[in-house]
Amino acid sequence: MERTFVYLKPNAVRRGLVGEIIKRFEQRGIKIVALKLFWMTREQAERLYEMHKGKNFYNELIEFVTGGPVVAMVVEAPRVIEMVRHIIGNTDPLKAGTGTIRGEFALTVTKNLIHASDSKENFEREYKIFFSENEIVDYYLDVQDDI
């Protein structure tokens, strides 16, 4: 099984889309193994987006993601990195496909509702900013035999 890190940005929380987004993952057989609601600190945001430091959108992004509560999770399934990125759609909502989270609900590139790790390496780096190993719960999901 593969794992990935996902977090719902403040506008997803404020717009009441948390349940809808989680539902889309669960309906695909994706197992949530860690989940929390919290305010992201500036330090966490800067660590998460360190590769964008110096870019013209960096400060706006940091202010946005620290400006309200977020929901972070670690999810698990076969090929979950690829699957989650397919479900959420392109970073640019105008390029995101119909039926994707961003295609249906997002308005701008910066405020695109959701972030997901794009590789195993980034998952390993990103989830550790928000979760300790003992916060990840292993359990049997009934649909596991079907995936």
UniProtKB/Swiss-Prot annotation:
GO cellular component: cytoplasm
InterPro entries: NDK-like_dom, NDK-like_dom_sf, Nucleoside_diP_kinase, Nucleoside_diP_kinase_AS
PROSITE patterns from the UniProt entry: NDPK (PS00469), NDPK_LIKE (PS51374)
Gene Ontology biological process: CTP biosynthetic process; GTP biosynthetic process; UTP biosynthetic process
Annotated active site: H115 (pros-phosphohistidine intermediate)
One Pfam family from the record: NDK
The entry's keywords: ATP-binding, Cytoplasm, Kinase, Magnesium, Metal-binding, Nucleotide metabolism, Nucleotide-binding, Phosphoprotein, Transferase
Cofactor(s), by name: Mg(2+)
GO molecular function: ATP binding; metal ion binding; nucleoside diphosphate kinase activity
This enzyme's EC code(s): 2.7.4.6
Annotated ATP binding sites: K9, F57, R85, T91, R102, N112
Keyword Transit peptide: no
Catalytic activity as recorded in UniProt: a 2'-deoxyribonucleoside 5'-diphosphate + ATP = a 2'-deoxyribonucleoside 5'-triphosphate + ADP; a ribonucleoside 5'-diphosphate + ATP = a ribonucleoside 5'-triphosphate + ADP
Compartments it resides in: Cytoplasm
Broadest EC class assigned to this enzyme: transferase
Family: Belongs to the NDK family.
UniProt function note: Major role in the synthesis of nucleoside triphosphates other than ATP. The ATP gamma phosphate is transferred to the NDP beta phosphate via a ping-pong mechanism, using a phosphorylated active-site intermediate.
Assembly and oligomerization: Homotetramer.
Protein name: Nucleoside diphosphate kinase
Organism field: Thermosipho melanesiensis (strain DSM 12029 / CIP 104789 / BI429)
Lineage: Bacteria, Thermotogati, Thermotogota, Thermotogae, Thermotogales
